[in-house]
Amino acid sequence: QIIEVYDPPGVRLPVVHADFYRLDHPDEVEQLGLDDYRLGAALLAEWPDHAGGFAHEPACLSIRIENAEKGRQAIVE
């Protein structure tokens, strides 16, 4: 499943988790109907480059996980 939705009361606001790894081309995002899920929700996107990226959107926060000397580190941009 590419899109999983988590609704309150389990979370404070709706969360849409999208794993775009299996997309072959960014145009495939339109077929998913992603905009139908996003209104009033937080979008957590894995492999956002497979979906064309989201950096152009307001309030976009990028978190990259990288291997570090001792475990992993999160880089927030």
Question: Residues of each region from the PLM?
Answer:
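Short phosphate-coordinating micro-motif centered on Lys-Gly-acidic
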Residues: 25-30, 35-77
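Nucleotide and nucleotide-moiety/phosphate-recognizing core
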Residues: 1-25, 31-32, 55-61
